[in-house]
Amino acid sequence: MAKGAREKIRLNSSAGTGHFYTTTKNKRTMPEKMEIKKFDPVVRQHVIYKEGKIK
């Protein structure tokens, strides 16, 4: 089977709580860094999550 184009990424909270989500994205169709608004349960608000590397 061929290797997929999807790569695992980590979405870090911009609120500084240390909370994160993990997801995948296609690097060929979305080469820029992802920013998405999601719920942060630590501050109990919707905040912007920015893409970071999985260690």
UniProtKB/Swiss-Prot annotation:
Example GO biological process term?
Answer: translation
Q: Does the keyword Ribosomal protein apply?
A: yes
Q: Which domain of life is it from?
A: Bacteria
Locate the region Disordered: 1-23
Keyword Ribonucleoprotein belongs to the record: yes
Q: Which InterPro entries does its entry note?
A: Ribosomal_bL33, Ribosomal_bL33_CS, Ribosomal_bL33_sf, Ribosomal_zn-bd
**Ranges of biased composition (kind: Basic and acidic residues):** 1-10
Question: What Gene Ontology cellular component terms go with this record?
Answer: cytosolic large ribosomal subunit
| UniProt keyword list | Ribonucleoprotein, Ribosomal protein
Give one GO term, molecular function aspect: structural constituent of ribosome
UniProt feature, compositional bias: Polar residues: 11-23
| HAMAP family the record matches | Ribosomal_bL33
Question: Which family, according to UniProt?
Answer: Belongs to the bacterial ribosomal protein bL33 family.
Q: What is this protein called?
A: Large ribosomal subunit protein bL33
- Annotated organism of origin: Tolumonas auensis (strain DSM 9187 / NBRC 110442 / TA 4)
